[in-house]
Amino acid sequence: REGHQKVLWPSKVKWFAKSSGTTDARSKFIPVTKEALEECHYKGGKDLLARYYSQKPDAKVYSGKHLVLGGSSKINPFNEEGYTGDLSAIIIRNLPVWAEIMRTPSRDIALMDNWEEKIEMIARTTMDEDIYMMAGVPSWTMVLLKRILELKGAESIKEVWPNLELFWHGGVSFKPYRDQFSKLIPSLAMNYVETYNAS
């Protein structure tokens, strides 16, 4: 984190994912290399898409936008050439073209620090887009969907985004949120995929 290179890995490390501190309540900063992004996170994303399409051959996820709700990142206070942040923010900052081209909102909005402002900006900039897929943690995604319903004066997210078919979620168990999402998105055609993207 302080800028020393090639200590444990042969290539340069400039990203450090802040862990949630689940093992002892303290956050840790885990190095994230270009190779880890490519061989773990993006490869995992491709695997998830391939599995989804193998189970749903008529899926149309790539016919419209993907709303990705992630965390934030900032300059590393120990080394100005590096960054620290949520793993989701590191992934968003470095997405390959095949994923970035479909993603919404803009990177500037997606990586905002203030969650209340971020939710408001995402709601206003995406509510009129053609969203086919969402990805994020259930809690903040639910807050976002409720705000969009308020802004649009709609009863259900399917009124706003009729082509929405998939929600990739992780970070926490989906079980406590399932009923609430079923009310927000009352559609038997809606698919939910739980994934845990470890730092």
What are these regions (language model features)?
Residues 1-199:
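Active-site phosphate/ATP/adenylate-binding loop shared across adenylate-forming ligases
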